[in-house]
Amino acid sequence: MNPKSNDANDSQNGTLQKNESAKSAKEIVMEYLQLITERQDFKSARSYLKDNVSYVSPLNSFDRAEPYLKYNESLHLPKLDIKKIFVDGDDVCILHETSLPRISSTVFTTLWFHVDGGKISSLRALFDPRPFIRPQR
């Protein structure tokens, strides 16, 4: 990295350098979640994801950003009621509840994000899928 540059990206080797201008994994994840829930700004959210982002949950899996974001857009996710956040380097784990009026249920979910080079490279969502698959009464 050019010592005179304030840029977080090292143009010679493409790696993100640790300095004041680099966002933490937690900051990246929290900004991304705000974009897809509160703001519903999926175009801006795309810039937080690697092209080959991996998403796995009990109901779906994706290995590219565009189909994953389209899926998220269809969910109309409300703001998350975050209970706890754990951070370990480039890994961020969020425990939250989401109230889903369309299925008359509140779902407790664990999200495990991995951030690589300043972008989200993987996300694992763990939750009980029964409210999504049982017939409506």
Task: Kindly give the residue locations of the regions a language model identified.
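C-terminal and inter-domain tail/linker signature
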Residues: M1-R137
